[in-house]
């Protein structure tokens, strides 16, 4: 279900809680910690992944729509969920004379922190993760698929690639 999908989204990196005394990437208290204790308040968080620096209230998302504040903890809704995978010639990428003639294993997730007026990939970049139902794909499986297709390059493309970064 949609709730399970969001609940199971991995904890994102590159954020900080805006709770008093909070530290980067960690809520100031763990929800439900200790038996019989009152659940601490959830706080807004600030995403530090890109230059937007989105301040995200509980239940809200950043401008890219790929990160969500779930009970005071930032979650990545796109990690391991590429919506498109293609093998492209490396020359299609904005890389000058890098491995000429090689294949690039290209993948993208939904979402983008930018709203470029003439984006040729707007159907992917301006959509939200729940617009596509895709199974979870582990990074090792992506690398194996690239090897099987004899693609020495993995390219995060079709949208701003920082939205996929979670390590």
Where do the PLM segments sit?
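N-terminal juxtadomain amphipathic helix
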Residues: 4-24, 36, 43-102
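Extracytoplasmic thiol/disulfide redox context detector
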Residues: 1
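N-terminal polybasic/positive-inside topogenic patches
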Residues: 32-34
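Intrinsically disordered, low-complexity segments enriched in serine/proline and basic residues
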Residues: 24-30
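Conserved Radical SAM active-site core
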Residues: 69-167
């Amino acid at each position: 279900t949609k709730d399970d999908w969001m609940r199971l989204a991995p904890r994102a990196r590159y954020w900080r809680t805006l709770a008093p005394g909070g530290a980067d990437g960690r809520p100031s208290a763990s929800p439900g910690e200790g038996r019989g204790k009152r659940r601490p308040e959830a706080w807004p968080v600030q995403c530090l992944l890109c230059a937007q620096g989105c301040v995200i209230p509980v239940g809200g998302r950043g401008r890219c729509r790929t990160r969500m504040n779930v009970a005071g903890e930032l979650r990545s809704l796109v990690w391991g969920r590429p919506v498109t995978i293609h093998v492209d010639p490396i020359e299609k990428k904005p890389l000058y004379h890098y491995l000429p003639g090689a294949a690039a294993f290209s993948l993208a997730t939904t979402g983008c922190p930018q709203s470029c007026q003439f984006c040729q990939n707007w159907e992917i970049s301006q959509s939200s993760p729940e617009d596509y139902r895709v199974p979870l794909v582990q990074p090792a499986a992506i690398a194996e698929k690239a090897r099987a297709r004899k693609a020495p390059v993995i390219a995060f493309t079709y949208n701003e690639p920082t939205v996929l970064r979670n390590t």
